[in-house]
């Protein structure tokens, strides 16, 4: 939740309008999802998320949501999958990585499940140590 807190602080500092905190159905569902997840269980529901992003980013984020809990994939594999779905011969893993990096709903849209081509843990907004911890938590969930 710390990563969400930092992002909320950045948003609050950059808002021109008055910021008012209130509980909404989406926030309530996201909180419930996170409570289940950090309680060590794989949530059996997805909050009704509507992240803002380009059509390409939306496609990549949809792929991220299809990566099973406790498993990882590579940027290259995501690029191949998206290229196949679009009927293209290939797609840039770097472009996919850029879209993954713009995911602002980390954990629920599981960008932490994407690793480098050699299986190494690569960039994560919350830090590599947090990415490793999330993957360990998921391994325990799926045993």
State where each predicted segment sits.
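Nucleic acid-binding interface residues in structured DNA/RNA-binding domains
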Residues: 32, 36-143
């Amino acid at each position: 939740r710390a990563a969400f807190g930092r992002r909320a602080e950045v948003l609050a500092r950059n808002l021109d309008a008055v910021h008012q905190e209130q509980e909404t159905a989406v926030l309530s569902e996201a909180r419930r999802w996170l409570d289940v997840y950090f309680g060590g269980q794989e949530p059996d529901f997805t909050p009704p998320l509507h992240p803002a992003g380009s059509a390409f980013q939306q496609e990549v984020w949809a792929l991220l949501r299809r990566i099973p809990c406790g498993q990882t994939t590579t940027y290259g594999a995501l690029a191949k999958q998206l290229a196949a779905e679009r009927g293209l011969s290939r797609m840039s893993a770097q472009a996919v990585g850029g879209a993954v990096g713009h995911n602002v709903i980390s954990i629920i849209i599981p960008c932490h499940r994407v690793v480098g081509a050699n299986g190494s843990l690569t960039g994560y907004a919350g830090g590599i140590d947090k990415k490793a911890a999330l993957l360990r938590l998921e391994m325990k969930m799926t045993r």
